[in-house]
Structures are given as C-alpha cells and as structure tokens.
Regions:
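An N-cap/entry alpha-helix motif that binds or orients negatively charged groups
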Residues: 2-78
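Structural signal for hydrophobic packing residues in well-ordered secondary-structure cores
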Residues: 51-58, 111, 115, 162-165, ...
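Generic structural signal for well-ordered, non-membrane alpha-helical segments
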Residues: 37-40, 44, 100, 104, ...
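Conserved active-site-proximal phosphate/metal-binding subdomains
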Residues: 1-29, 217, 236-261, 268-337
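Flexible, glycine/proline-enriched loop segments at strand-loop-helix junctions
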Residues: 94, 119-121, 142-149, 181-187
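Long, hydrophobic, well-ordered secondary-structure blocks that form the structural core
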Residues: 117, 128-152
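Alpha/beta enzyme core
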Residues: 109, 137-138, 149-264, 271-294, ...
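N-terminal functional module of multi-domain proteins
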Residues: 43-129
Length: 337
C-alpha cells in the first residue's frame, strides 16, 4: 500500500476529517468532535504555516558518507526521530471503524514495525489509558501519556503504566484547557512545580511534560526534574490565539536544550518539517492527525507507508544539506524567509 492509497481509502472510512492531501487544519478548522482547533480555529493552520516559512540551505560540498536517520532516545534506538502523537477517544472524534483497543494496538504495533514508536492517550473513560498500556505491552514499546488529573489518579495511572512495562511516561499538562478536566472533583488541571516534581519522583522512569510553549514553562519543567518536554499547543485544541510551535522552539531549545530532551509537535507533516524542527533545536518530533488518517485508511500498512515517506524525505534533506547524521543538523542548515 502506498501513502496515496491509504489517504484515498481513509476518505471513505473516517468521520469528521476529510483526509486532505495537505493536512493543514483549514478544512476541519473548528470541527470538534473531530480534528479541529478551539475558538476561531486558527492555531492548527498557524502551526502548519510556520514550518512552510522556514527553508533549507542547499550544500552538497561535503563528504559523501551516506545518511543515518536513526536516534537513541528513551533507552531505545529508532529508525527516525519521529513518534506518533497521543490521541484518545478516537471513536468520538474519528468514527466507529475502530474501538479504542483496536485503534491503539494498530498504532503501537504499526509504529514499532515501521521502526518508530507511538505515544498513547488518556481520557475520562479508564479504557482509554488502559488500551494504551495494553497496546504498549503487545508492541514492546510506547509512551503512555496521562492527563493532569488529581494526584491520586495520576499515581494510580503511573502504577498501571509501569506494571505494563512502561520505560517512559508523559503528561500532556496543556490538557488543563479541556472542559472535562476543569469540571472534575477533586480538582484536575494545571500543576505547580512541586506537584510535577512529585510525579517525576514517583514515576522513577523518564517523565516528559507535554504542552510547554515558553522558556518560562521549560525552566519550570526542568526545575521539577522532568527528563524532557514536548513543545506543543495541543494542536490548537486548548487555547485560541497561541503562537505556532515552530515560532517558539528555538528560544526554548536555547534555554534548556543542553539539559533535557526536547520533542516538538504541531503541523509537522513531512520529512522536510522534521529536518527543520531538528535544526531549530528539537531532538525529535510528534505527528498526530496524519497518523490517525493512516490507521483509518490502511492500518499498519498505512503507518508503514507514511513513515517510509517521512524517512525518504528526511534522508533527501540530509543528503542535500551536507548532514550525515542527525547531530549534524543545526541552524546553519535553514533559512528564514
């Protein structure tokens, strides 16, 4: 199956999403349930457009050493610095083709077979997190991502993830902006540095804070002892009028990049975008909506096709900019138009 075939198939299988040739957030702008953004629906398109305003510096006066796109992270080696982003409640947002267990297992196993890995989701229904942990166990590796619930529930979910073999865990702290979290008793949502530190210490495995958009926030995550951060605005789904992740990444990387792992998401769609993210200071990227489309359009074959496309594009970028390894990619490789 090719990427184009999976995309075409998804158009008859997926709800609330048009499986567009270019996943730029415009056609689905305010579609929630579905892949849309909050409020005016401008943040997801802004994420995408910000990457398009960064260009690559052609330079082939370099040793012809071949290209290595692999990365070592989470104590594992992966073929690409790319991971599928955590998405839960897929039946609600994307239609009934799969239940949560089926979708998450396909995603986790498909990503591992393709040489990468998935972050898995969470939600009000306990099934969402449990499905991710079950899929992680079957796939051999995934990163469970817990919502910023009240302390006792976070501890319970950390225990559950570790019992199923988690080697790292994340918290999408920006989910504080989701209505169901705001309404919970006891209170859930934003966390202090001290509360985050409790989670980090309790986990005892690398803990990643997802939803950091400022240098100030990155420094707080560092102070809490997080192993890494994910620069993310939740795909535009939690706060309208946010800047694009590409616009804030460099400053954050300058502040904490030598002290913790940095992953970024938001509008990354091609291997060229992956290259740009690494040049700005990220160690790896998360990609969300396109991987959902691939599951609905082609299951594990769709995941393999899209991942192969990303690898071919990233390889080409590296060859044509004189970068033999990911470590060679830096800001001298990009141009801001």
């Amino acid at each position: 199956m090719t990427y184009e075939e999976a995309l075409k198939s998804a158009r008859t299988e997926i709800a609330n999403c048009h499986a567009c040739p270019v996943c730029n957030g415009i056609a689905c702008k305010k579609t929630i349930p579905g892949p849309g953004s909050k409020g005016a629906g401008t943040v997801a398109p802004r994420n995408y457009e910000a990457w398009q305003k960064i260009y690559l510096n052609l330079d082939t006066i370099a040793p012809n050493l071949g290209v290595d796109t692999s990365i070592e992270i989470f104590g594992e080696k992966f073929d690409l610095p790319v991971f599928a982003a955590p998405i839960g409640a897929v039946t609600n947002h994307y239609g009934p083709k799969y239940n949560e267990y089926e979708y998450t297992e396909i995603m986790a196993k498909g990503c591992r077979a393709a040489g990468i890995a998935a972050f898995t989701g969470d939600g009000l229904n306990e099934m969402f997190f449990e499905a991710g942990c079950t899929a992680m166990e079957k796939a051999g590796f995934a990163v469970p991502t817990v919502k910023p619930w009240h302390k006792d529930l976070v501890f319970k979910k950390i225990d559950y993830a570790k019992a199923h073999g988690a080697k790292a865990i994340a918290m999408d702290i920006d989910a504080s902006g989701l209505p169901f979290l705001k309404a919970m008793t006891p209170p859930s949502g934003s966390k202090s540095v001290e509360e985050l530190r409790e989670f980090v210490e309790y986990a005892g495995i690398p803990f990643f804070v997802k939803g950091v958009m400022t240098v100030k926030g990155a420094l707080k995550a560092l102070e809490a002892g997080a192993a890494g951060i994910i620069v993310s605005n939740h795909g535009g789904r939690v706060l309208d009028h946010c800047p694009a992740t590409a616009s804030v990444l460099a400053d954050i990387a300058d502040a904490v990049g030598d002290k913790m792992t940095i992953i970024v998401d938001g509008g990354i769609r091609t291997g060229h975008d992956v290259f740009k993210a690494l040049a700005l200071g990220a160690d790896a990227v998360l990609i969300g909506r396109p991987y959902v489309v691939m599951v609905y359009g082609g299951a594990e074959e769709g995941i393999a096709a899209y991942t192969a496309k990303l690898k071919a594009e990233l390889t080409d970028c590296m060859q044509m900019t004189g970068c033999a390894t990911l470590a060679d990619i830096d800001r001298s490789c990009i141009f801001h138009g």
